[in-house]
């Protein structure tokens, strides 16, 4: 199977939550010859719709114990080839951990599984049904030569791959160890967050607990990105990196101290009343040190978001306080391909808009309705708010999102959480949302982003300790506080400490 590099921010989010947990691997697995048991998975084991392409022991290295690595391909329907990798450690803790990916997937890495293996988890991963060298360009696998949608692969990517990876993974674990996993958990961010919600909604029996970070759970992430791109591509509206730095400093000057602590992080960007016109150029100012009228207009537009004629959201607002992290997500400041700035919509114009040659410059708020009613939206979006089957079986869901995420909107995740609480009886005992101030997409940003999500999920599922506050720290920084179960947020106090309010 081909391997590709996973988005660094996604890996950082996964590794940060795994690394600090104090729980160690539990009892050793039943006595057996690991090498023989591993080889037998390729030579003798038979799994439905699956070809095991390799199974071999990998020696221990540093913090990783020796493990059996199993690679295979699942072919549930014609045209489908779902690559899977399972890593089965010697010091198995009798649990399984499935890991999501980022972007349009197409990648499986050891790096993503390292911390889980170190703690004794059998890890489960998939390429989501295709190989893809760039996280934002889906054209190589999602589009047929005639320009039509490659529906088998798009459905694999949307939900089928992660489910089949899980069911097969449980069988592989049981075959290798001679015992079923006592618990199965899932962790992912971005696309991985969407996959986590998809599991909760479509396949509620797969996992005992799910961590879904910054979920790109509807195509509004892509439509929002496209509308923002067009706002900054208007004549005279382009922003350069120095403009973003200028705006960031002005926002903090206007709003930072109002949340109880002038620490470089806005606790709740929604409360910030910064007005872009305060940076408008006056006579004699250098263009890099101020904003021209078109730039002010574009900035106001992305701060406010856009709506359809019906009043429904077309583009979520970009929240204030995270401007220093906008570079990758604003067309004028990024040198990448168009997909980098529109969330990959450029390559999927055919499946989304019914026209493979659609001019994206003509994308408007009303085009959003066509995207949201497309066939792809029907299989891709994880927007079901009634998650009763998952809740009834005792499943636990931790949602989290950085408040400075310039990709999928934090507000969209809050919107989903609040709707699910209303739609699902007793979900308040099965679901938590944590909003992390100053944290960008799946990690990074100015706020503390090292949070032990997996330990929190284990404590909830295995010890009935529902998470309410979780310590958050930042590498090479003294800035730290507890992230709080929403709607509470960490708030600065007069003594320099923070509390959840």
Could you describe each region identified by the protein language model?
Residues 198-200, 205-307, 435:
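A catalytic-pocket lid/entrance helix-loop region that shapes and gates access to the active site
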Residues 431-444, 476-477:
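Histidine-bearing beta->alpha loop at or near hydrolase active sites
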């Amino acid at each position: 199977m081909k391997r590709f590099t996973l988005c660094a921010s996604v890996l950082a989010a996964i590794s940060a939550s795994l690394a600090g947990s104090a729980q160690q691997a539990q009892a050793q697995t039943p006595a057996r010859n690991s090498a023989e048991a591993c080889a037998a998975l390729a030579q003798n084991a038979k799994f439905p719709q699956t070809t095991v392409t390799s199974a071999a022991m990998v020696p221990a290295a540093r913090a990783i114990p020796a493990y059996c690595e199993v690679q295979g391909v699942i072919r549930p329907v014609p045209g489908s080839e779902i690559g899977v990798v399972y890593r089965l450690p010697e010091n198995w803790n009798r649990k399984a951990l499935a890991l999501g990916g980022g972007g349009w997937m197409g990648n499986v890495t050891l790096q993503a599984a390292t911390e889980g293996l170190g703690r004794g988890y059998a890890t489960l991963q998939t390429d989501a049904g295709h190989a893809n060298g760039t996280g934002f360009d889906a054209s190589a696998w999602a589009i047929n030569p005639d320009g039509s949608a490659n529906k088998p692969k798009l459905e694999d990517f949307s939900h089928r791959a992660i489910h089949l990876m899980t069911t097969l993974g449980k069988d592989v674990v049981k075959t290798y160890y001679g015992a079923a996993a006592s618990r199965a958990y899932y962790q992912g961010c971005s696309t991985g967050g969407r996959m986590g919600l998809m599991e909760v909604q479509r396949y509620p029996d797969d996992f005992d607990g799910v961590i879904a970070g910054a979920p790109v759970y509807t195509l509004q992430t892509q439509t929002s990105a496209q509308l923002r791109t067009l706002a900054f591509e208007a004549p005279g509206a382009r922003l350069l990196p120095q403009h973003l730095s200028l705006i960031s400093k002005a926002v903090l000057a206007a709003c930072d101290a109002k949340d109880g602590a002038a620490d470089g992080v806005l606790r709740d960007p929604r409360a910030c009343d910064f007005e872009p016109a305060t940076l408008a150029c006056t006579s004699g100012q250098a263009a890099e040190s101020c904003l021209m009228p078109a730039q002010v207009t574009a900035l106001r537009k992305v701060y406010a978001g856009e709506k359809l004629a019906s009043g429904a959201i077309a583009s979520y607002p970009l929240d204030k306080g995270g401007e220093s992290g906008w570079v990758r997500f604003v067309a004028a400041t990024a040198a990448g391909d168009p997909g980098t700035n529109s969330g990959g919509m450029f390559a999927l114009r055919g499946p989304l808009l019914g026209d493979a040659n659609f001019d994206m410059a003509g994308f408007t708020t009303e085009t959003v309705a066509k995207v949201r009613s497309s066939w792809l939206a029907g299989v891709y979006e994880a927007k079901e708010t009634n998650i009763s089957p998952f809740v009834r079986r005792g499943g636990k869901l931790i949602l989290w999102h950085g408040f400075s995420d310039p990709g999928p909107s934090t507000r969209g995740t809050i919107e989903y959480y609040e709707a699910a609480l209303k739609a699902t009886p007793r979900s308040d005992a099965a679901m938590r949302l944590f909003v992390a101030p100053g944290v960008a997409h799946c990690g990074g940003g100015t706020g503390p982003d090292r949070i032990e999500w997996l330990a929190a999920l284990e404590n909830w599922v295995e010890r009935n300790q529902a998470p309410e506050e979780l310590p958050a720290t930042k590498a090479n920084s003294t800035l730290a506080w507890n992230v709080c179960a929403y709607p509470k947020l960490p708030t600065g106090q007069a003594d320099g400490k923070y509390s959840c309010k």
